[in-house]
């Protein structure tokens, strides 16, 4: 019966791992076992250039995922040389290129990369391309390939509450003025688009707002992966992600035209989103622009503009960390870009509780320890039931071994005597499994809550752990993880099969190797959980006398 129990556990564990890996791949993540090689650095968008057909056509054409949008640009008129303008606030440093009037580099000043430099989100460099673009279609109008002229004015927030810049271009009978407003303490850039018909005939311009980036993954680990790619939200269809693979295969779908919603680009810990004004009709599109270069966007028809008339519209551009409370306050559904995995309903409340604990303790590492202790206390009755069952099984081990020896050649008789022994001693051989199975969703939810939380970036714990989002630099926590797992196996009943026993002894080593590459915050959670489990199991064993004696064989 012990062998069957162990086999069931192995099958169950393997099934959980394989299901998790399938879920990873179904949601656009890399497989843990057979990762798909990433395509080389994007060939699109070298600095100062754009691919052919880079300006979108109308949404009904562009929405056909995987196809290349038709060019909408005409012959370029004489234009001034472009320049780069840097706007600085307390949270952002934005480099705006007048060639297109777009932010070609956005640094998050309070978010550091692993080298201690400001995190770069938008970028147009040799290594990567990630841009928020806008312009007009429906004619030979100013777009993100047109050179704009920048208005004079302050470029630094200083002691003020906001700083703004207006960039203007005139082309094809349409004058477009883009105004960006950067505010203190905000990752949202308020944007205003003023269109004036300075020609002699009516025009029908459409404003497009798009996020374009290469398909390269960021901050990925060999043993876990997170989603990178476009996402869209509307009041009707709600939130859904679009994988680069689906775009390549022509399987990507976007919502029907509506008057609500936004588009986003998501990566681990960070996101960007174009959010148009409320109750304005919009159409969505997503496609591949060039090799390994993708975009998702919104088109907003501005109606007919008579000669000499003007029309204006607004939008907000968010670019920053996935801080749930902040995202909720910006627009409905934006907090969904934070990926809690398939146990969101459990993970979100757990992270809410973790935030409350952090407000008291002021240290994310100790907050993880405290939350793990609280969860362990909540599940104490279930865990106690499991450990009592395992302790009794360990107590019966000599008698079970004797039964196996007596009935080596008669499995049926052996199983009958085993069942009689279980009934006599009132032991359920699966009693140690079910309580643990019930707890697995909570532990998996906390795993995802920690993995997805940007708050762990750069957050220290003690001594050598300076960043809970990166692996332990000295591998102390993974070693403690292996030791704690080894101690747990010693407290459990010893498998009767020598090969089985060796496998159980090898598992701590295998798991510790995997945890060498996990973020320190996740490993800290598992170490604390294991140590609490050891303390609880040891105390129950001691209470039942299992640590000091074993039932005599009969």
UniProtKB/Swiss-Prot annotation:
Function: Required for the insertion and/or proper folding and/or complex formation of integral membrane proteins into the membrane. Involved in integration of membrane proteins that insert both dependently and independently of the Sec translocase complex, as well as at least some lipoproteins. Aids folding of multispanning membrane proteins.
Record-level GO cellular component terms: plasma membrane
UniProt keyword Repeat, yes or no: no
InterPro entries: Membr_insert_YidC, Membr_insert_YidC_N, YidC/ALB3/OXA1/COX18, YidC/Oxa/ALB_C, YidC_ALB_C, YidC_periplasmic_sf
Region called Disordered, residue ranges: 40-66
UniProt name for this protein: Membrane protein insertase YidC
Subunit relationships: Interacts with the Sec translocase complex via SecD. Specifically interacts with transmembrane segments of nascent integral membrane proteins during membrane integration.
Entry similarity comment: Belongs to the OXA1/ALB3/YidC family. Type 1 subfamily.
GO-annotated molecular function: membrane insertase activity
Gene designation: yidC
Gene3D superfamilies noted in UniProt: 2.70.98.90
Location within or outside the cell: Cell inner membrane
An annotated GO BP: protein transport
Organism: Ralstonia pickettii (strain 12J)
């Amino acid at each position: 019966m012990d062998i069957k129990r162990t086999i069931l556990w192995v099958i169950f564990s393997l099934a959980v791992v394989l299901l998790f890996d399938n879920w990873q791949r179904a949601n656009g993540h890399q497989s843990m076992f057979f990762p798909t090689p990433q395509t080389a650095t994007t060939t699109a968008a070298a600095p100062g250039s754009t691919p052919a057909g880079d300006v979108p056509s109308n949404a009904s054409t562009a929405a056909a995922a995987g196809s290349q949008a038709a060019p909408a640009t005409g012959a370029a008129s004489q234009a001034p040389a472009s320049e780069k303008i840097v706007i600085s606030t307390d949270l952002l440093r934005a480099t705006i290129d007048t060639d297109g009037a777009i932010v070609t580099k956005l640094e998050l000043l309070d978010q550091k990369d692993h080298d201690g430099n400001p995190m770069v989100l938008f970028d147009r460099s040799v290594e990567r391309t990630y841009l928020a673009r806008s312009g007009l279609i429906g004619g030979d109008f100013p777009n993100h390939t047109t050179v704009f002229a920048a208005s004079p004015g302050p470029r630094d927030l200083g002691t003020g509450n906001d700083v703004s810049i207006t960039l203007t271009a005139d082309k094809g009978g349409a004058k477009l003025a883009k105004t960006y407003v950067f505010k203190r303490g905000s990752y949202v850039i308020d944007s205003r688009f003023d269109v004036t018909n300075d020609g002699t005939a009516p025009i029908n311009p459409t404003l497009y707002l798009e996020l374009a980036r290469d398909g390269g993954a960021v901050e990925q680990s060999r043993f876990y992966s997170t989603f990178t790619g476009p996402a869209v939200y509307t009041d009707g269809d709600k939130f859904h992600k679009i994988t680069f693979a689906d775009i390549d295969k022509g399987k990507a779908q976007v919502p029907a035209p509506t008057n609500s919603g936004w588009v986003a680009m998501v990566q681990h810990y960070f996101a960007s989103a174009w959010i148009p004004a409320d109750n304005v009709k919009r159409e969505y599109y997503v496609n591949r622009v060039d090799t390994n270069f993708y975009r998702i966007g919104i088109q907003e028809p501005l109606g007919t503009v008579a000669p000499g008339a003007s029309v204006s519209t607004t939008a907000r551009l968010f670019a920053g960390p996935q801080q749930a409370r902040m995202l909720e306050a910006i627009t409905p559904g934006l907090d969904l870009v934070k990926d809690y995995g398939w146990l969101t309903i459990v993970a979100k409340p757990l992270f809410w509780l973790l935030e409350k604990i952090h407000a008291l303790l002021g240290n994310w590492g100790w907050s993880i320890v405290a939350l793990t202790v609280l969860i362990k206390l909540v599940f104490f009755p279930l865990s106690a039931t499991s450990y009592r069952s395992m302790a009794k099984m360990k107590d019966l081990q000599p008698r079970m071994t004797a039964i196996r020896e007596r009935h080596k050649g008669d499995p049926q008789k052996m199983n009958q005597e085993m069942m009689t022994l279980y009934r006599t001693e009132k032991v359920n051989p699966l009693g140690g499994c079910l309580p643990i199975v019930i707890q697995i969703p909570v532990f998996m939810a906390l795993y995802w809550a920690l993995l997805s939380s940007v708050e762990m970036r750069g957050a220290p714990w003690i001594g050598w752990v300076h960043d809970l989002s990166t692996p332990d630099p000295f591998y102390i926590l993974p070693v403690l993880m292996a030791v704690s797992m080894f101690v747990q196996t010693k407290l459990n009943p010893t498998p009767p099969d020598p090969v089985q026993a060796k496998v159980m002894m090898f598992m701590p080593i295998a798991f510790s190797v995997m945890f060498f590459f996990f973020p320190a915050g996740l490993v800290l959670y598992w170490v604390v959980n294991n140590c609490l489990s050891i303390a609880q199991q040891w105390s129950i064993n001691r209470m039942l006398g299992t640590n000091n004696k074993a039932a005599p064989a009969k």
